[in-house]
C-alpha cells in the first residue's frame, strides 16, 4: 500500500492553499467548527478528485450518466484511490419516497416477482401461464405412458369456410356439446356453437412421440395457438397466446417495471401511481354559472395567468369546446377530463423560453387539475398545505395505496402479493426469505442480495421498519441509517469512502452500532473519511484532521493533523479544548419555572402507545429516546397539528392547555430552496430593505433606477452576460468561471454606479455578516436581521452566499435566525427537530444560549434532540422507548435531567457523564494494529467458457501475466471473470439506473467467488473503432486547451482579420453615445412570427408595454392598426441619447435581450433614420456578427462539429458499374430521390440517357463525374442525395471523408480557429503533434496551472509512443496499435491508486523500440500501488512480471487448466524467401501528404513484403493511402497482374448472435440437405429448412434458436442460461427426432469440427472448409459455435482461414494490417507458412507486422520511421531480404 495520500495547494472555497495528508486504510475524522471548510476539503476536493479521475476511465455510456464534478482547485493529488460519497440524504418528502424505494428493497422484490412470480388475471384470478410449444410438450411428458390422449383445436361457430378447410385436410370429427359428431354434417351451415376439432387420438408411449409432436403442432396451428387435451377424464387447455379468452385481456410477462409506481405505464389508472385519490366533497366549490375562462374552479390555475390560459386553450382546441362556456353547459365527459385528465392526452403548448429569448412549442401531458393537486400532495411534507377547501384525499380504493396496476397487484410470489411483502417489517421479511426452499442460482443471487441489504438495515437498528413506510414519517436518525445501508453493503477494498456526519440524529446507544459498521468497512481494506462533530466518534478515528481555527473567512486552514491521542494532548483548537473540558457548556444554576402546561392525550400515531404527555410551558423541554422510539411521531405528527388546531380554532379534543399560548413556530429539517439565486440575505428578508435603501439614494432618480434595478434576479439590474449569477459556463464545460463582463458582481454597470457609504450593492453582498453588522448600525431594520446571524455563529457568512452552498448546520441556524430577527411578545411555542444537526460543540453552546433566551422571555421551547449537551441543560426531559418500532412508543421518563440519571433508560446511561463534576476524557486506545489486507485477489472455482473449475490467486500491487496458447482461457479469466466481477461489485455502489448502464453489457461470470477486489479498469484490444473524437479529447487535453484559450486568447475576425469586439448592452450604449449623441433611439424587438398577433399584443399590454413600431412609425399597442404592418416590432423604449440617459438605455437594452435574441434600433439623428440589428456575441469592424466564445453554437455549421465532410464518388470505379447507365445507378442507389437534375448534365455533355458507363470514353466519364461550370457532376449529385438520407447504407469504398474547408477540420465555428495566443490558434495546435504543443506551452510559462496539467498529459502520450500523432486526428483514423496505446494513456492518466488494471496483450504488435517505454509505464502503475493483470499471448512480457499464471495446455476444450509451467512449444523454421528477379512485375507507390512523403516505392508482386516501424511512423497510411490506392489504379489498367484486392485488419468480422461457424463457411446447407434426405425426416415431413435454428419452422420457439436465454435481471448483470426447453440444442423437439449416427442435428452443431469431418467424410462439399479449419488449429471448435462468443484470437484465426486458407484461384493482392498481433506463436508460425504458400501460388502479400520472424522470412522489407525533423514519416529502408535466417525460430 502507498505510505501516504497527499493533496497539496487546495484553494476550494475558503480553503487557504492547504495541504492534507493521510494514510490509506485509516478512519480519518475531519472536525472543526461549522463552516470551517471540512466539507470543502472532504467532498469538494478529495471526493471530487477521486471520482473525476476514475469516471473518466470508464466507458462513455457510464461516464455521461453521472454528473461529473469539475476538477477541484488543487495543485497536486498523490496516492488517492477511487472515491465514493455518502452524503446527508434528505429524501424527497412525498408518499412515493419509502424505505423500500430508497434502500432498493422494492427493486429487489420487483425483480424476484418478474423472475419467479406467478401472474394472475385480476378479474377471474385465474393463474396465467404463457406456454411455448416446448413447454406444452414438457407438460404432456409428465403424463404416464399408456394414457390415451385426445388433442382438440377450437372451432368457431358459423364459419363454413373453416369447416370445409378442415374436411379438406382430412379431419372428420368434432366435439360439440360433449358429443362426437362427423364434421360433414356442418358443411352447409358451419357448427352452430363453438366446438372443438378432433386432431388426433393416440396412446402415449415412446414409439408415438414423433406422432404426438406432429399432432400437437398441427393442433396449435389450426387452433391459432390454443390446444385442448383430454385424458383420464381430465381436460387441460394450453395457449401460446397472451390473451385470456374469458376476459379478452392481453397480458405481458411480469417485469420489474410493473412493480414501480414511478413507471409512466402500468400505473394505477385512478390515482396515477401516487396511491392517493383526491375527490370533491363540496360540489358548490365549482361555480356552475361561470366558465373556465372566468375561473369557475377556484382550485385550478387562473386564466389570468398566461401559462394556464395557454394550456386550457390548447385543451379546449383539442376537445372542441370553448373556455367561455359556463361549467354547467359543458358535457360530463369534458368536465371529467378537466378534473381528472385522460390517459395519453398530450397538448401542444406554446410557451416563452427565456433562455432562447423566444416562444417555443412543447407538449404537456394533461392529467387533470385534481390529479395535478394530487401530484403536489404527493411531493409535499404537509399534504394539507395543498389540499383546497371542499376536497379530501384518501388511499386509492382501486390499488389500495400501492399505486400499481391491477395486474401487478394480482401477482403472487410464494403466496404473497407485492403489497403483502411491503407491509412486513424488515425483520419479518428477512425471516420469510430465510424459510424459502433453495432456488435457481440466478434467483438465489437476488435473494442473497436482498437478504444482505436487510441484514445491514437490521444491524443498524432498523428491524421494525416496513418497506412501505414513507420516509417523511422517519426520524432523522432513521433516515440517515437508511441512506447508509444503501451504500455500505459492497465488499470492495481499496475505495476511499467519504461520509457526511453519519452520526446525525443518532442516539448515543445507536452510535456504537454505526461505529461497528464503519470499522468493518475500514477492515475490509478501505479508507474512511468522516466529516463529524460527535465527540464519541473520536474514539473510532485513526487520524484527526482539524480544520479552522474559525469559520468562513476565519477558517480554511488545517490546524492539526495527527492521531487522536496527539490531538487531545497537543492541539489548541476549539474541538480539543471541549474534549479536554477546558471549555464547557455550563449546566444552568437554576432551571426555569413552569408557567403552565400542555397536556396531549391519546397520542397513537404510528408506533405511539396511546400516550398522555404533559409538556411544561415557559421551559425548555427536550424529547429524547433511541431512534425509532416515536419522538417525531409524538412531536411533529401529533403535537404540532394539535397545537395548530388549538390556536386556529380555540380548542382541540386531544389537547389541554393550562397557561398562555398564542403562537407556534415549527422549525423542522426541511431545507429551503437551494437555487443559485437564493442567498442568505433574501432568506432572512433583508434584501428587499437593502434594495429600497439603494433606490432612495439621490442619484437613482435622474438615472431612472428603481428598486427593481437592484435585484440580480430581474433583467433590469442583472448582468446581461451571466444573467445575474456572477459566473458562466465556458465551452460546454461544467466548470463555471467568473463572468468576464461583471467580474462576478452580478449587476449591470449603471447599477453599480450607485453607492451607499461608498459601497455598491455588490460590495455589500460580499461582506460577511460580521462586517455588515457594524456597517448597518444606522439602519435598525437591516441591522437586527444581520445581528441574528451573528448571534447564531454565522458571522463569517457572506451576505450574498448562495443557499445551495451552505452546510447542513448553517441551514439550520439560518432558519432560526430568520425567526429571531422578528421577535414577538406573544407567548410562543417553538418546536425544533434536532437543531444541533451538523453543529460543532462550540456552535451548540451559542445555540443553547439563544434557546435559553427564548425561555427567559416567557416562551416555550420543545426540542427533539440526542445531543447530551442539550439534554443536560434542559428544564424538562421526555424520553420515549424503550426501543424502536413496535417495541417503542412508550413514555419511559418525564422529569428533570438530574432525576433522569437515576433511572435505568438508554438516555440516562449516556447523560450521566455529562452531569458529573469530573467528566472522563474520551477513551482513546493506543495505535491500532490494522488487520492485514488480503495479499491477493482470490478467484474460486472459475468455470467460465473453457476454464476447468480453477482456483487462482493474483497478488495485489504486482504485475501478473496470464500466458498460454490462444483460446486457452486467458481472456475468460481476466476479462469475463475478473473484470465482470469487479464491474458488478463497483456498480453496487450506485443507484439502479446508473448500475444498469454500467453492467448492461456485463454477463454474469461463471465463478463461485472473487474476493479482494478493488475498482477495475479494463482495456481490451477489440474496442470500437468508431469514435469521431480527437486524440486530444481522449485525455481531456482539448478541454484544457479550450479553457486556456477562453481565459487568455484573443478572438480575431475570419473575414476582416481584425480583433473582434464584444456586443453587449454596454458596447451598444457606448456606440450610441459616441456616434449619435443628441439623437433619439427607439429600442424594439420583432414580433415572434409563430405568435398570434392579437394574443401577443394583449400579453404585452398586460406587461406594461404601450407602443408598436411598424411601417417606419409608431402605433399604440391597443390599436387600431392599418391593414398591412411591415416588420412589426414591440417598442421597449424611446429615449434621447444623452449621457444622463445611459443607465435608462442600458436597462432597456438588457430587457430587450431578455425577451428576444435579436433586437433592432431605429436611430433618428439630424433628420436621418438609421436602423441597426444587434445580437449578443462578437462583431468585427465590418459589422459581421459571431457567437461569443461561451456560446453553445460554437460548432462549425457546415460539418456540425465533425471536422470532415462525406463525399460520394464513382470516378475510380468505372469498371464496377460498367453495365449501368447514370440514371439506373442513381435510382438504384437512391430509390427515393428525384433523378431529374442529372438530365441537364447529360444534355450538356451530349451523353444519351441510355448510354452505359462502359460505352463512354474516359474523358466523358470524368466530365460526367466532376461536372461543368453550369451543372454539378454525378458525384456531387450523389453526395447531395446521400447527405439527405444519412442513415442509408452505401458501399464504403464509394464514400470518402475530406476535411471541412470552413473549419480546417477542427469542427469549430470559423472565428474560433481565429482566436489566438501568440499568433497560435487552436486549429494550429490540432494540426500539430506533441512536441509542437509542448514548445508552445513553454512559451506561456509552466507556472500556469492549466499549462502544467497539459504537460503531464503530453508526457504520458510520449511515453506510450504517441508523440508524433496529430492531436486533432480522429481516434477512428488511428491504427489499431495507436488506438490501443491511446486507451492505455487515457487509463494511466488518472493517477489513481488501489485500482486493478486489466490489459490485453499491451506489447503485441509493438515495435521493439517502443516496448521498453510502454513497459516502464506499466511498471510505474504498479509502483503507484495498483494491481496490473495482463494477458500475454507471446510470453514477451512474462519475463518482466512479478507473477505468471500459465493456462493450457491446448486451445479450446483441452485448455483452461492451471499449469505449473508454460504451454508454449518450440516451433520449426519455415522455407526461405522467394528469389525476386528483375523480371517480376512491381507495384509503384507514391504518397505525398503532410504526414507521409514517399515517392516511387516499387513493391515486387508475387512475393511476401513486410512493413515494420515504430508507432506513428505511417505504416497503415502507406498501406491504405499508398499501396491500396496504387493497387486499385493498377487493377483498372491491367487486371492480368492481379484481379482482386483483399484488405484484412486486426478487427474480427462483424457477427450477429445467429452467425456460427457452420453458416459462416457455408457448411450447414449440405448437412441440412443430408439430414432431410433421411427416412425419419421424410416420414415426419421435415424439410431441409427445418434443420436450421435460424428459421421459424426449425428453431426452438423458447430461445428463438439461440440455445440460451438471456435473463434480464434489471439492475443485476444479464444471465446467459442454457435453454431448458431444447437443452441448448437450438432446434425444435420434432427436428431432434431425426438421428444419424446417434446424433440429431442439434447435437451435430455441438460436435467439434474434427468429429464432423470424420463422420461426414463422404460429403466432399464440406470437407474443404472443415479440413482448412482443422489445418489452422481450429478443429476443436464446435460446428455451431457462435461467432460472437469466440476469443479474439479465434475470431482472427477464423477470418484468416476464410480469406487466406481458402484463397481465390486467380492472382490476388492481399493487404494485411496487424492480423498477427492477436495470434500466439503457434498461430503466427501457421500464418507465415500459409503466406509463403500463397506467394508460391502467384499471389502477392503485403503485411504490417513488427514481429521479427516476419521480417526474417519476408521477401521484401519496408522499414518506416520519422524524418530527422520529425515532421512526417519516411521509409528508412526498402529492399530485397538478401539473407533471411532460416535457423531462427519464433520467439
UniProtKB/Swiss-Prot annotation:
Q: Name one GO biological process term.
A: SOS response
Q: Where does ATP 1 bind?
A: 410-417
Pfam families associated with the record: UvrA_DNA-bind, UvrA_inter
Q: Where are the zinc fingers (C4-type)?
A: 719-742, 1596-1622
Q: Where is this chain's protein located in or outside the cell?
A: Cytoplasm
Binding residues for ATP 2 = 625-632
Q: GO MF terms on file?
A: ATP binding; ATP hydrolysis activity; DNA binding; nuclease activity; zinc ion binding
Q: Taking every annotated instance into account, which residue ranges of this chain make up the domain ABC transporter?
A: 300-574, 594-912, 1254-1474
What keywords is this UniProt entry annotated with? ATP-binding, Cytoplasm, DNA damage, DNA excision, DNA repair, DNA-binding, Excision nuclease, Metal-binding, Nucleotide-binding, Repeat, SOS response, Zinc, Zinc-finger
How does it associate, per the subunit comment? Answer: Forms a heterotetramer with UvrB during the search for lesions.
Question: Which family, according to the similarity comment?
Answer: Belongs to the ABC transporter superfamily. UvrA family.
- By its UniProt entry, which NCBIfam families does this protein fall under? PRK00635.1 (NF001885), uvra (TIGR00630)
Q: What is this protein called?
A: UvrABC system protein A
In which organism is this protein found?
Chlamydia muridarum (strain MoPn / Nigg)
Q: Which gene encodes it?
A: uvrA
Amino acid at each position: 500500500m502507498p505510505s501516504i495520500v497527499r493533496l497539496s495547494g487546495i484553494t476550494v472555497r475558503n480553503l487557504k492553499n492547504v495541504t492534507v495528508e493521510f494514510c490509506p486504510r485509516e478512519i480519518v475524522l475531519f472536525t472543526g467548527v461549522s463552516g470551517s471548510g471540512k466539507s470543502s476539503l472532504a467532498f469538494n476536493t478529495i471526493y471530487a478528485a477521486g471520482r473525476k479521475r476514475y469516471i473518466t476511465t470508464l466507458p462513455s455510456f457510464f461516464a455521461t450518466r453521472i454528473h461529473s464534478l469539475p476538477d477541484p482547485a488543487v495543485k497536486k493529488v498523490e496516492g488517492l484511490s477511487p472515491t465514493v460519497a455518502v452524503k446527508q440524504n434528505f429524501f424527497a418528502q412525498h408518499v412515493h419516497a419509502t424505505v423500500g424505494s430508497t434502500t432498493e428493497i422494492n427493486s429487489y422484490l420487483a425483480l424476484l416477482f418478474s423472475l419467479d412470480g406467478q401472474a394472475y388475471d385480476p378479474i377471474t384470478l385465474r393463474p396465467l401461464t404463457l406456454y411455448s410449444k416446448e413447454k406444452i410438450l414438457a407438460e404432456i411428458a409428465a403424463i404416464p405412458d399408456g394414457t390415451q390422449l385426445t388433442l382438440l383445436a377450437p372451432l368457431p361457430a358459423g364459419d363454413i369456410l373453416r369447416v370445409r378447410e378442415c374436411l379438406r385436410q382430412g379431419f372428420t370429427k368434432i366435439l360439440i356439446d360433449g358429443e362426437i359428431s362427423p364434421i360433414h354434417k356442418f358443411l352447409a351451415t358451419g357448427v352452430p356453437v363453438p366446438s372443438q376439432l378432433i386432431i388426433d387420438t393416440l396412446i402415449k408411449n415412446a414409439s408415438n412421440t414423433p406422432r404426438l409432436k406432429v399432432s400437437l403442432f398441427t393442433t396449435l396451428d389450426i387452433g391459432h395457438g390454443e390446444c385442448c387435451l383430454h385424458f383420464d377424464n381430465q381436460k387441460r387447455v394450453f395457449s401460446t397466446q397472451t390473451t385470456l379468452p374469458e376476459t379478452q385481456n392481453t397480458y405481458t410477462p411480469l417485469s420489474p417495471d410493473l412493480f414501480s409506481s414511478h413507471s409512466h405505464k402500468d400505473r394505477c389508472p385512478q390515482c396515477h401511481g401516487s396511491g392517493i385519490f383526491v375527490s370533491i366533497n363540496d360540489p358548490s366549490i365549482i361555480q356552475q354559472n361561470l366558465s373556465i375562462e372566468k375561473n369557475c374552479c377556484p382550485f385550478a390555475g387562473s386564466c389570468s395567468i398566461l401559462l394556464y390560459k395557454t394550456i386550457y386553450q390548447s385543451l379546449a382546441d383539442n376537445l372542441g369546446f370553448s373556455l367561455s362556456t359556463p361549467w354547467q353547459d359543458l358535457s360530463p365527459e369534458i368536465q371529467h377530463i378537466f378534473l381528472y385528465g385522460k390517459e395519453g392526452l398530450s397538448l401542444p403548448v406554446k410557451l416563452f423560453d427565456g433562455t432562447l429569448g423566444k416562444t417555443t412549442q412543447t407538449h404537456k401531458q394533461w392529467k387533470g387539475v385534481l390529479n395535478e393537486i394530487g401530484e403536489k400532495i404527493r411531493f409535499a411534507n404537509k399534504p394539507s398545505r395543498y389540499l383546497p377547501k371542499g376536497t379530501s384525499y384518501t388511499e386509492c380504493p382501486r390499488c389500495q395505496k400501492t399505486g400499481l396496476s391491477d395486474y401487478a397487484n394480482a401477482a403472487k410470489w410464494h403466496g404473497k402479493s407485492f403489497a403483502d411483502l411491503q407491509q412486513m417489517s424488515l425483520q419479518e421479511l428477512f425471516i420469510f426469505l430465510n424459510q424459502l426452499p433453495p432456488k435457481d442460482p440466478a434467483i438465489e443471487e437476488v435473494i442473497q442480495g436482498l437478504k444482505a441489504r436487510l441484514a445491514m438495515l437490521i444491524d443498524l437498528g432498523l428491524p421494525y421498519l416496513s418497506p412501505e413506510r414513507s420516509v417523511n414519517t422517519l426520524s432523522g436518525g432513521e433516515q440517515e441509517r437508511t441512506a447508509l445501508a444503501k451504500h455500505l453493503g459492497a465488499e470492495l477494498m481499496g475505495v476511499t469512502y467519504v461520509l457526511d456526519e453519519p452520526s446525525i440524529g443518532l442516539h448515543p446507544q445507536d452510535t456504537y452500532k454505526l461505529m461497528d459498521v464503519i470499522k468493518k468497512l475500514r477492515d475490509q481494506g478501505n479508507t474512511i473519511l468522516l466529516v463529524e462533530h460527535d465527540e464519541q466518534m473520536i474514539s473510532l478515528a485513526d487520524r484527526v484532521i482539524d480544520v479552522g481555527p474559525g469559520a468562513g473567512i476565519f477558517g480554511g486552514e488545517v490546524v492539526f493533523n495527527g492521531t487522536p491521542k496527539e490531538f487531545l494532548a497537543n492541539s489548541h483548537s476549539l474541538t480539543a479544548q471541549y474534549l479536554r473540558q477546558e471549555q464547557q457548556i455550563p449546566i444552568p444554576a437554576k432551571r426555569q419555572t413552569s408557567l403552565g402546561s400542555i397536556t396531549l392525550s391519546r397520542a397513537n400515531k404510528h408506533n405511539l402507545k396511546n400516550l398522555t404527555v404533559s409538556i411544561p410551558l415557559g421551559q425548555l423541554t427536550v424529547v429524547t429516546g433511541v431512534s425509532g422510539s416515536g419522538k417525531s411521531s409524538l412531536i411533529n405528527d401529533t403535537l404540532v397539528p394539535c397545537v395548530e388546531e388549538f390556536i386556529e380554532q380555540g380548542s382541540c379534543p386531544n389537547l389541554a392547555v393550562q397557561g398562555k399560548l398564542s403562537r407556534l413556530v415549527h422549525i423542522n429539517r426541511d431545507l429551503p430552496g437551494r437555487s443559485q439565486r437564493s442567498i442568505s440575505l433574501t432568506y432572512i428578508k433583508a434584501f428587499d430593505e437593502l434594495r429600497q435603501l439603494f433606490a432612495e439614494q439621490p442619484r437613482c432618480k435622474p438615472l431612472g433606477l428603481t428598486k427593481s434595478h437592484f435585484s440580480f434576479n430581474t433583467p433590469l439590474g442583472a448582468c446581461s452576460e451571466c444573467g445575474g449569477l456572477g459566473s458562466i459556463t465556458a465551452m460546454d464545460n461544467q466548470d463555471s468561471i467568473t463572468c468576464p463582463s461583471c467580474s462576478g458582481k452580478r449587476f449591470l454597470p449603471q447599477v453599480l454606479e450607485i453607492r451607499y457609504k461608498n459601497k455598491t450593492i455588490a460590495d455589500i453582498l460580499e461582506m460577511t455578516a460580521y462586517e455588515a453588522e457594524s456597517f448597518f448600525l444606522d439602519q435598525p431594520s437591516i441591522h437586527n436581521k444581520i445581528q441574528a446571524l451573528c448571534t447564531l455563529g454565522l458571522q463569517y457568512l457572506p451576505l450574498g452566499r448562495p443557499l445551495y452552498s451552505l452546510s447542513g448546520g448553517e441551514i439550520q441556524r439560518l432558519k432560526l435566525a430568520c425567526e429571531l430577527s422578528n421577535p414577538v411578545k406573544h407567548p410562543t411555542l417553538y418546536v425544533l427537530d434536532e437543531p444541533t444537526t451538523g453543529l460543532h460543540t462550540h456552535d451548540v453552546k451559542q445555540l443553547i444560549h439563544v434557546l435559553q433566551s427564548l425561555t427567559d422571555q416567557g416562551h416555550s421551547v420543545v426540542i427533539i434532540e440526542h445531543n447530551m449537551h442539550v439534554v443536560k441543560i434542559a428544564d424538562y426531559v421526555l424520553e420515549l422507548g424503550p426501543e424502536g418500532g413496535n417495541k417503542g412508543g412508550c413514555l419511559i421518563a418525564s422529569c428533570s435531567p438530574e432525576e433522569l440519571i437515576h433511572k435505568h433508560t438508554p438516555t440516562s446511561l449516556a447523560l450521566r457523564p455529562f452531569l458529573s463534576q469530573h467528566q472522563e476524557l474520551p477513551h482513546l486506545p493506543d495505535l491500532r494494529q490494522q488487520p492485514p489486507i488480503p495479499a491477493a485477489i482470490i478467484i474460486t472455482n472459475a468455470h467460465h467458457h473453457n476454464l476447468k473449475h480453477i482456483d487462482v490467486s493474483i497478488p495485489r500491487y504486482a504485475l501478473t501475466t496470464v500466458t498460454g496458447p490462444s483460446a486457452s482461457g486467458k481472456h475468460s479469466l481476466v476479462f469475463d471473470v475478473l473484470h465482470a466481477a469487479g464491474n458488478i461489485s463497483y456498480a453496487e455502489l450506485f443507484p439502479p439506473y446508473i448500475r444498469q448502464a454500467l453492467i448492461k453489457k456485463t454477463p454474469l461470470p461463471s465463478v463461485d467467488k472473487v474476493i479482494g477486489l478493488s475498482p477495475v479498469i479494463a482495456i481490451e484490444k477489440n474496442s470500437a473503432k468508431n469514435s469521431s473524437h480527437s486524440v486530444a479529447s481522449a485525455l481531456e487535453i482539448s478541454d484544457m486547451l479550450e479553457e486556456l484559450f477562453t481565459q487568455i486568447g484573443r478572438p480575431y475576425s475570419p473575414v476582416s482579420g481584425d480583433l473582434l469586439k464584444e456586443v453587449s448592452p454596454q458596447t451598444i450604449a457606448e456606440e450610441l453615445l459616441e456616434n449619435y449623441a443628441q439623437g433619439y433611439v427607439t429600442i424594439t424587438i420583432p414580433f415572434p412570427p409563430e405568435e398570434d398577433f392579437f394574443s401577443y399584443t394583449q400579453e404585452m399590454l398586460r406587461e406594461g408595454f404601450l407602443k408598436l413600431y411598424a411601417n417606419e412609425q409608431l402605433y399604440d399597442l391597443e390599436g387600431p392598426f392599418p391593414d398591412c404592418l411591415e416588420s412589426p416590432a414591440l417598442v421597449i423604449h424611446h429615449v434621447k441619447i444623452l449621457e444622463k440617459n445611459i443607465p435608462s438605455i442600458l436597462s432597456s437594452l438588457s430587457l430587450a435581450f431578455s425577451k428576444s435574441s435579436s433586437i433592432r434600433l431605429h436611430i433618428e439623428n439630424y433628420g436621418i433614420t438609421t436602423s441597426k440589428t444587434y445580437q449578443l456575441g462578437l462583431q468585427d469592424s465590418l459589422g459581421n456578427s459571431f457567437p461569443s466564445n461561451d456560446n453553445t453554437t460554437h460548432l462549425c455549421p457546415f460539418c456540425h462539429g465533425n471536422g470532415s465532410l462525406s463525399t460520394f464518388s464513382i470516378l475510380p470505379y468505372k469498371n464496377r458499374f460498367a453495365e449501368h447507365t447514370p440514371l439506373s445507378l442513381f435510382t438504384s442507389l437512391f430509390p427515393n430521390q428525384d433523378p431529374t437534375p442529372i438530365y441537364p448534365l447529360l444534355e450538356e455533355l451530349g451523353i444519351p440517357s441510355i448510354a452505359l458507363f462502359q460505352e463512354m470514353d474516359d474523358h466523358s466519364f470524368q466530365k460526367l463525374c466532376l461536372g461543368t461550370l453550369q451543372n454539378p457532376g454525378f458525384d456531387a449529385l450523389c453526395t447531395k442525395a446521400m447527405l439527405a438520407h444519412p442513415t442509408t447504407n452505401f458501399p464504403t469504398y464509394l464514400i470518402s471523408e475530406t476535411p471541412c474547408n470552413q473549419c480546417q477540420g477542427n469542427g469549430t465555428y470559423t472565428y474560433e480557429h481565429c482566436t489566438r495566443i501568440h499568433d497560435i490558434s487552436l486549429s494550429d495546435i490540432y494540426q500539430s503533434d506533441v512536441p509542437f504543443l509542448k514548445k508552445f506551452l513553454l512559451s506561456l510559462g509552466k507556472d500556469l496551472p492549466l499549462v502544467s496539467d497539459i504537460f503531464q498529459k503530453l508526457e504520458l502520450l510520449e511515453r506510450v509512443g504517441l508523440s508524433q500523432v496529430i492531436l486533432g486526428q480522429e481516434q477512428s483514423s488511428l491504427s489499431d496499435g495507436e488506438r490501443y496505446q491511446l486507451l492505455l494513456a487515457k487509463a494511466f492518466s488518472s493517477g489513481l491508486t488501489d485500482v486493478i488494471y486489466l490489459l490485453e496483450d499491451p506489447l503485441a504488435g509493438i515495435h521493439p523500440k517502443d516496448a521498453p517505454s510502454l513497459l516502464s509505464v506499466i511498471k510505474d502503475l504498479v509502483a503507484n500501488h495498483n494491481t496490473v493483470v495482463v494477458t500475454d499471448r507471446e510470453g514477451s512480457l512474462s519475463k518482466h512480471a512479478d507473477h505468471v499464471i500459465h493456462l493450457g495446455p491446448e486451445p479450446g476444450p483441452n485448455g483452461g487448466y492451471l499449469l505449473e509451467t508454460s504451454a508454449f512449444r518450440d516451433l520449426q523454421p519455415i522455407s526461405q524467401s522467394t528469389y525476386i528477379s528483375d523480371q517480376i512485375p512491381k507495384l509503384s507507390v507514391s504518397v505525398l501528404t503532410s504526414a507521409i512523403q514517399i515517392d516511387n516505392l516499387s513493391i515486387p508482386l508475387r512475393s511476401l513484403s513486410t512493413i515494420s516501424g515504430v508507432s506513428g511512423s505511417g505504416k497503415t497510411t502507406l498501406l491504405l493511402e499508398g499501396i491500396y490506392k496504387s493497387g486499385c489504379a493498377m487493377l483498372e489498367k491491367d487486371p492480368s497482374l492481379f484481379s482482386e484486392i483483399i484488405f484484412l485488419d486486426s478487427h474480427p468480422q462483424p457477427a450477429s448472435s445467429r452467425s456460427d461457424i457452420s453458416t459462416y463457411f457455408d457448411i450447414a446447407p449440405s448437412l441440412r440437405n443430408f439430414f432431410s434426405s433421411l427416412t425419419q425426416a421424410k416420414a415426419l415431413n421435415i424439410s431441409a429448412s427445418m434443420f436450421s435454428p435460424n428459421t421459424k419452422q426449425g428453431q426452438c420457439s423458447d430461445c428463438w434458436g439461440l440455445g440460451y436465454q438471456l435473463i434480464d435481471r434489471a439492475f443485476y448483470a444479464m444471465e446467459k442460461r442454457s435453454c431448458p426447453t431444447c437443452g441448448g440444442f437450438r432446434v425444435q423437439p420434432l427436428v431432434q427426432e431425426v438421428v444419424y449416427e446417434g446424433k440429431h442435428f442439434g447435437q451435430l452443431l455441438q460436435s467439434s469440427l474434427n468429429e464432423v469431418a470424420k463422420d461426414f467424410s463422404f460429403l466432399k462439399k464440406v470437407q474443404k472448409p472443415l479440413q482448412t479449419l482443422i489445418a489452422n488449429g481450429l478443429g476443436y471448435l464446435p460446428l455451431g459455435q457462435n461467432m460472437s462468443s469466440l476469443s479474439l484470437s479465434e475470431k482472427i484465426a477464423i477470418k484468416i482461414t476464410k480469406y487466406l486458407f481458402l484463397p481465390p484461384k486467380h492472382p490476388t493482392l492481399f493487404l494485411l494490417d496487424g492480423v498477427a498481433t492477436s495470434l500466439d506463436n503457434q498461430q503466427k508460425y501457421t500464418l507465415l507458412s500459409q503466406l509463403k504458400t500463397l506467394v508460391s501460388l502467384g499471389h502477392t502479400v503485403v503485411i504490417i507486422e513488427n514481429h521479427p520472424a516476419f521480417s526474417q522470412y519476408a521477401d521484401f522489407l519496408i522499414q518506416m520511421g520519422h524524418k530527422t525533423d520529425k515532421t512526417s514519416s519516411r521509409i528508412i529502408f526498402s529492399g530485397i531480404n538478401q539473407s533471411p535466417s532460416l535457423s531462427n525460430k519464433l520467439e
